[in-house]
């Protein structure tokens, strides 16, 4: 814009000079003195040609003086400079926004004032902060350890370097000097190599070529295999959190063999509890939620130590997960404390037609102290299909024994009770009558010879021994009549308001720890 205005101003000046030259030519022609040549150019105020003619018409003989004697021919004419049309005798003409005076032509830039640039409109970089423009502040992030340790200037690269990697420490700094000092202090104390600065465009968190991928160290958990469907991107709806598709016998045998042969190498998110016949999973923080769900469906979990966000149990049944959330929110003062889920479960039972019995669980929730995991040992796995029934009876006996131990505990709070699951926690107060009735109802529903989905004489015999130790009596009409038969799946899922007609009856006498009750 400034260049255009300057050119327009120069155009006006040239037009004024052109008008002045034309006026002088007209004046010379009127006086007949064209032979005297061009007159010297003076910086005079421009006038119109009509004004020149009108000025000449006002001349009188008295106003004209005699010309002195000339030494050269052709100089007898009147000197045009003595006429009355000199600039001082002319009326100024307004030709622009301002009147132009002769002195302006002697000034720099023809007298045109050059406006000073304002500071706000300046494009000089140091003045940007004064005009309100804020420069972006770059933070620096130090990833102290892990496979991608270094100093980053981008949070996206830092998150990719630390996300999903357990035990990685990182911190944000305002300047590169502070970040470098913190990184050097850490590497010096740990006696490790100096951390490199990794700009945003040079961060290589994944191999760029197939050759680099082959030379990269394999992931520690690459050998694990999950049996379920593809992991959903978000928590499934309550109706989707179930064991459908139902766990098959092949799935159970795979998990059973996996936990028996696990020796603790390659995965620090779990350890095992090994017995002579069976090994059970113990899941720690950052365990695979899909693996936890499948082991829960197989009845092969002893303990779960979840993170504060409970991500490890997010695929368990919704009511179980909600009960754990309520315990963390309502039952403990410090919600940041670690908790545990101690599970006693039966295992599935199959027939030729398919799944006959789904596991039943008794789960205790509590605050976890310092965890000292046991050493996992690789155990021999020689289980056959015909051995599954014997294993199911063994886990069923342990389940009944754990359930009956609740009668000896005087301070219990029932967190959730369902048809096949009971969740409880320790309480500082005595067990209320409502919780006591819930425990007794659950015992009556599950403690019977049909615990595993079919009538099992071995289970009945075990119940007789347990009840007789407590001074009670037990009767099973199927055992008395010699009708130990295998029931179908419908016998295990009878109506909730009453036991199925094939249930046996357990009668107990009054004892100091329990009231007289009927268990079917």
Swiss-Prot record:
Query: Any signal peptide, and if so, which residues?
Result: none
The record, for Pfam families, names:
Cauli_VI
Primary location recorded for the protein, binned into one broad class: host cell
Q: Which InterPro entries match?
A: Ribosomal_bL9/RNase_H1_N, RNase_H1_N, RNase_H1_N_sf
Positions of the UniProt region annotated as Disordered: 487-520
Gene Ontology CC annotation, any one: host cell cytoplasm
Q: Which GO terms describe its biological process?
A: regulation of translation
Q: Which UniProt keywords apply?
A: Host cytoplasm, Translation regulation
Localisation per UniProt entry: Host cytoplasm
Other remarks on this protein: The inclusion bodies are the site of viral DNA synthesis, virion assembly and accumulation in the infected cell.
Function recorded in the entry: Enhances the ribosomal termination-reinitiation event leading to the translation of major open reading frames on the polycistronic viral RNAs.
Which family does this protein fall into? Belongs to the caulimoviridae viroplasmin family.
Kindly provide the name given to this protein in its UniProt entry.
Answer: Transactivator/viroplasmin protein
| The organism of origin for this protein | Cauliflower mosaic virus (strain W260)
- Tell me the lineage of the source organism: Viruses, Riboviria, Pararnavirae, Artverviricota, Revtraviricetes
